[in-house]
């Protein structure tokens, strides 16, 4: 398990764009499972939406990517590098994510050619899928 201090050593993301709080399982270069505690203090809730706060879907996708980035950046050849989105495929949002929810995010590498790869990812709240899809990335 990796706490926030270890996560900050691995990925380059920082507040307010760090969207993973803990890694609870990881296989270097293959898969990771992480947690995002969603609180009303998140800056995006000020405008999305003030009377009905909902986590923006694009930030759920970003959280999934950051969990995957932890697994990939543990590989020796990628340590200290920066992961970039190259695309997203088959992403579906199934339920809204609200303050107080705990996102449990799982990512698994599907393919990797050099520094370009694809992963499948799923985000769940209380065991129910809220978002799933495929993430394409490049590591530079």
Swiss-Prot record:
Active site: 48
GO cellular component, one term: cytoplasm
Compartment(s) of residence: Cytoplasm
Catalytic activity from the UniProt record: a (3R)-hydroxyacyl-[ACP] = a (2E)-enoyl-[ACP] + H2O
GO biological process: fatty acid biosynthetic process; lipid A biosynthetic process
Annotated InterPro entries: FabA_FabZ, FabZ, HotDog_dom_sf
Keywords from the named record: Cytoplasm, Lipid A biosynthesis, Lipid biosynthesis, Lipid metabolism, Lyase
EC class: lyase
One protein family per Pfam: FabA
EC number assigned by the record: 4.2.1.59
Membrane-crossing residue ranges in chain numbering: none
GO molecular function: (3R)-hydroxyacyl-[acyl-carrier-protein] dehydratase activity
PANTHER family with a match to the protein in the record: 3-HYDROXYACYL-[ACYL-CARRIER-PROTEIN] DEHYDRATASE (PTHR30272:SF1)
Family, as annotated: Belongs to the thioester dehydratase family. FabZ subfamily.
The protein's role, per its UniProt record: Involved in unsaturated fatty acids biosynthesis. Catalyzes the dehydration of short chain beta-hydroxyacyl-ACPs and long chain saturated and unsaturated beta-hydroxyacyl-ACPs.
Protein name per UniProt: 3-hydroxyacyl-[acyl-carrier-protein] dehydratase FabZ
Chain's gene name: fabZ
């Amino acid at each position: 398990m990796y706490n926030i201090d270890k996560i900050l050593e691995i990925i380059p993301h920082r507040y307010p764009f760090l969207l993973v709080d803990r890694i609870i399982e990881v296989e270097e270069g293959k898969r990771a499972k992480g947690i995002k505690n969603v609180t009303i203090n998140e800056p995006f809730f000020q405008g999305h939406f003030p009377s009905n706060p909902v986590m923006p879907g694009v930030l759920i996708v970003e959280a999934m990517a950051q969990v995957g980035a932890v697994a990939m950046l543990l590989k020796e050849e990628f340590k200290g590098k920066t992961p970039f989105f190259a695309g997203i495929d088959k992403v579906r949002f199934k339920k809204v994510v609200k303050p107080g929810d705990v996102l449990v995010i799982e990512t698994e590498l599907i393919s990797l050619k050099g520094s370009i790869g694809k992963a499948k990812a799923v985000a769940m709240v209380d065991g129910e899928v809220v978002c799933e899809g495929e993430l394409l990335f490049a590591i530079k």
